[in-house]
Amino acid sequence: MTDTATRLAFARAAQAQRRLHRRPPASPRASPGARDGGSPTQRCGQAYESAALRWLARQGLRPLARNLRCRAGEIDLAMRDGEVLVLVEVRARAHAGYGGAAASIGASKQGRLARAAALLLPVLLRRHWPGAPPPVRFDVVAFEAGRPHWLRGAFWLAEHAPAQGRRGQDAQGWRVR
């Protein structure tokens, strides 16, 4: 065998060995706690989302979807308030320290929610809104000490804000009231 042929044979053998010892890809359900509904933190978050869903439904909003996920992030709840599509972020804090639950939704979180909404809107609109796209409002349900606080219109997507009541737009394109 020539030197080049020998090196090629060794390289192929090494590649075959690596292939044999390669770990199989982890399944999405392989994470700890997946069989029993997630980690304690995830189960707590799901409980608050369920409570927010029930509470908003009692306030007259109609549920459309829950836990919408895409590569940009997740939207906890999608609901309908008359002719407005409402995307809801649910937050909970045991204590009001560091500004509380509502204060934890800063500009970066709003940006992630807006990017997720931009990716998920076509599906939601196709499924629930024939015709012209509705105004899109972001609400926050913040649980502090177990009590819900509803922040209606915490922020709007600029291109989907209602025409009446606009007071301006900040540098990131958010409607400012």
From Swiss-Prot:
Record-level Gene Ontology MF annotations: nucleic acid binding
Region (Disordered): 13-43
SUPFAM superfamilies: Restriction endonuclease-like
InterPro entries: Restrct_endonuc-II-like, tRNA_endonuc-like_dom_sf, UPF0102_YraN-like
Gene3D superfamilies in UniProt: 3.40.1350.10
Source superkingdom: Bacteria
NCBIfam families, alphabetized: PRK12497.1-3, PRK14685.1, YraN family protein
Family membership noted in the UniProt record: Belongs to the UPF0102 family.
Protein's name in the database: UPF0102 protein BPP4042
